[in-house]
Amino acid sequence: MTFKDLNITEPILKAIEEKGYANPTPIQVKAIPAALTGKDILGCAQTGTGKTAAFAIPIIQHLQALKNWDKSIKALILTPTRELALQISECIDDYAKYTQVRHGVIFGGVNQRAQVNMLHKGVDILVATPGRLLDLMNQGYIHLDNVRHFVLYEAYRMLDIGFIHDIKRLLPKLPKEKQTLFFSATMPDTIIALTNSLLKQPVKITITPKSSTVDTIEQTIYFVEKKEKSKLLISILHKTEGQSVLVFSRTKHNADRIVRVLSKAGIGSQAIHGNKSQNARQSALENFKTGKIRVMIATDIAARGIDINELPLVINYDLPDVPETYVHRIGRTGRAGNLGTALTFCSQEERKLVNDIQKLTGKKLSKVEFAI
């Protein structure tokens, strides 16, 4: 099947071809036709499967067909982090380049002046994080009366305890008659129950079993004393010289500490987490994507904007508290049919978390005892 078979219009097809995409992914095959008919969608597919295009392409096509153009926001895409908002905005920029559809992105952590100026000029699609969106709404800069399409991206994070209050404040501001699209890499039962109350007879799309891991990723657990994790990391990085490596840390403090430890060992790295300025985070991401640095230390929330198709190695320096997060983390490697490796460092107190991960994914992980 090709994108042309999905009844996508010529201007968007041209942009897709320029991106080098020949065939749609499974989530795109199922979601794009349904979205083009205006149906609500509840879509669950792993990281790196093309979810962004699955909602962006039909929304652009819907808006391009409008006869009456004005400055109002017609599509709202809500996402949990600044990095992910920027990533989605870049995709829309690519797919909409040969259309009249205008889009913009807003997020916190930067001066609002440029964002307000952009809103005054008018945008058809607005990509936003919840905090800045509500802030600018309260100031009277944003009105959602004409929103026809509402997207909640990475729904399991957006509807988590940290965002639920923002979502509840936002929903009454949206028109009752609209298309609602929920997309996420994981869809726990608690989220499904909540989305069922917000979606109208949605088309439910699940491309892989929830919280599964792809077969292209070789997964290994290293049982190691907590104090020896740094030595193990340095050893592995020396053995994988030349490869880009994404290392996950549970906390911001530990991410910075790992950078210092690696620096003393002569290994250059950068950390990306919520305490870093927006400019610092963007700079670090760019350095990692272009290969200026080969090792990136990231916390889970900050890593949402890291989108590299050929990342060979992911290391879990700390195990995540939530097993679904493990799936998200290692989903950064083994993309688009490429082989990937995921290594996890597990101390004595973290061993129960390994059992939770194996129970969730249905896979036994290879185990290695590490001792200096």
Question: What residue spans do the PLM features occupy?
Answer:
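Conserved helicase RecA-like core
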Residues: 2-372
